[in-house]
Amino acid sequence: MSGKPKRLMVMAGGTGGHVFPGLAVAHHLMAQGWQVRWLGTADRMEADLVPKHGIEIDFIRISGLRGKGLKAQLSAPLRIWHAVRQAKAIMRNYQPDVVLGMGGYVSGPGGLAAWLCGIPVVLHEQNGIAGLTNRWLARIAKTVLQAFPGAFPNAEVVGNPVRTDVLALPLPAERLIGREGPIRVLVIGGSQGARVLNQTVPEVAARLGDKITLWHQVGKGALENVLRDYERVGQTQHKVAEFIDDMAAAYAWADVVVCRSGALTVSEIAAAGLPAIFVPFQHKDRQQYWNARPLEEAGAAKIIEQPQFNADVVAELLAGWDRPTLLAMAEKARAVAIPDATERVAAELVRVAK
């Protein structure tokens, strides 16, 4: 790249679903010579995670408004105004060529500050239903991108940027053909676990016995109780962990996944090429349900709403899927994936920054 390097500011925070896709795009552009800084909040996961990836981070003070009491609601305009002022000072100091909003509380004041400073804003919506912040910012953004169809009526569908180690996995036909033995079931409820999965899956193991083998991520603080449940039903042979560090290895091992349907999880499962049983978290706007719908419609997954999620239903479903069926579902999942999502988002940032 000739001349002065282009500068990107990424606005993302709160959860891995916002932060990890932002990191994927940041690393891609850094490899092309771009300078990248991050806008976040000091009390959320980005504060520790982003610097570990070699990216400097600036902080503003902002928190969510949903579900807060009357006093917090009344003080919200003042808090937002202060956050916008902080973000404007950061933008003027760094002078980015373009700002990427990936969602989270920080994107609202950050996006407004960028717009007030005349800096173009590119939004990326990870979920099938747009979040409140992105719905508002879409009015002032230069470009709106979406991972799944339907979040915004006219936005380009580019997928979710996912980790390179997941994209590097062998295709389903290479990975799954020739496998024998029990069906390998990977159970993941996110880094915090999911109580309904932890309570139900040991009972599924009891019903299916040696027809399946499990690798179960239970989440922080749940390991002892879940191990006790497996012991109670005589199923101590399964691999149970508080947290799985190498998700690519877990996806490579699995024949099928049982999990929540957060945006990043759904996108990783599609990129890996895996069948899934999705149990959407019960959001008011059914965000996780709509994330999972494209894979269910493609014949690659089954959605079980939480009130209907029980050991009998799951055991019957898994027992009905033989290896040829699982391979066909895996290939359908991979066909839905958008493996070049990172490149698509980066290309739009390059275009807007010219």
Swiss-Prot record:
It is found in: Cell inner membrane. The keyword Magnesium does not apply. It comes from the Bacteria. Keywords: Cell cycle, Cell division, Cell inner membrane, Cell membrane, Cell shape, Cell wall biogenesis/degradation, Glycosyltransferase, Membrane, Peptidoglycan synthesis, Transferase. Gene3D superfamilies: Glycogen Phosphorylase B. UDP-N-acetyl-alpha-D-glucosamine binds at T15, G16, G17, N127, R163, S191, I244, A263, L264, T265, V266, S267, E268, Q288. GO terms for biological process: carbohydrate metabolic process; cell division; cell wall organization; lipid glycosylation; peptidoglycan biosynthetic process; regulation of cell shape. Pfam families: Glyco_tran_28_C, Glyco_transf_28. InterPro entries: GlcNAc_MurG (IPR006009), Glyco_trans_28_C (IPR007235), GlycoTrans_28_N (IPR004276). CDD domains: GT28_MurG (cd03785). It catalyses: di-trans,octa-cis-undecaprenyl diphospho-N-acetyl-alpha-D-muramoyl-L-alanyl-D-glutamyl-meso-2,6-diaminopimeloyl-D-alanyl-D-alanine + UDP-N-acetyl-alpha-D-glucosamine = di-trans,octa-cis-undecaprenyl diphospho-[N-acetyl-alpha-D-glucosaminyl-(1->4)]-N-acetyl-alpha-D-muramoyl-L-alanyl-D-glutamyl-meso-2,6-diaminopimeloyl-D-alanyl-D-alanine + UDP + H(+). Coiled coil: none annotated. Its main location: membrane. One of its GO terms (cellular component) is plasma membrane. Its EC number is 2.4.1.227. It is a peripheral membrane protein. Pathway: Cell wall biogenesis; peptidoglycan biosynthesis. Cell wall formation. Catalyzes the transfer of a GlcNAc subunit on undecaprenyl-pyrophosphoryl-MurNAc-pentapeptide (lipid intermediate I) to form undecaprenyl-pyrophosphoryl-MurNAc-(pentapeptide)GlcNAc (lipid intermediate II). Belongs to the glycosyltransferase 28 family. MurG subfamily. This is UDP-N-acetylglucosamine--N-acetylmuramyl-(pentapeptide) pyrophosphoryl-undecaprenol N-acetylglucosamine transferase. It comes from Serratia proteamaculans (strain 568).
